[in-house]
Amino acid sequence: MNNFIGIGKIVDSAENGRVLKFDLAIQQERPCFVPCILFDPTDEVKESVDQLQTKNRVVWLQGRVSMNEFEYQGRTIRKIQVVTYANGIRPI
């Protein structure tokens, strides 16, 4: 089963067409920034994410872990991110 649940603050959100990317800042001894992506977000979800980031609110986030692998300048690059579920972001 591939299930990610995290609690943190949304930072660095950016919309690019049908994709919303952001980081989930998880507070620990050293903050951990988890890259997240949300496909085809509704206007309501986009506005909600923007408000949660602006108000610096702590959120509960659920999604699945995804790894992309590609070649760049002869090197294999691996990128891990959380594909967030549309209803998987809730303020705490």
Feature locations, PLM:
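Single-stranded nucleic acid-binding surfaces, predominantly the OB-fold ssDNA-binding core
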Residues: M1-I92
